[in-house]
Amino acid sequence: MGRVRPTTMDGRPLEALELEHFPGLCERQITAMAQRLQQQHRAGAILVLHRVGRLAPGEPIVLVAVEAGRRGAAQRCAAALLEELKHHAPFWKREWCAGQGTWLAENTPL
């Protein structure tokens, strides 16, 4: 499970993170990512729940669950999917700090 970070990209205290998406397109792209990684890691069922809207620091933002015959395969698949979501899922993110919103041009590193 991923949570909203407590600071902005430049290290200031975060008030909130706002996520927007294009309904339909976002879900299709996440499904395609999950299916590709499911095959690559020989995983079984995959569940992805990703929140949108305004979220406070520390709140859950994404849940990835992977079933596989072996624990290692499930862990590798889940880690790869979290990275894919972070860098390639079509979300627009705005950080709120001191009452000001700033749209992010890129995602945060690990």
Q: Where are the predicted features?
A:
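N-terminal, polar/charged subdomain of small-to-medium soluble alpha/beta proteins
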Residues: 1-61, 67-110
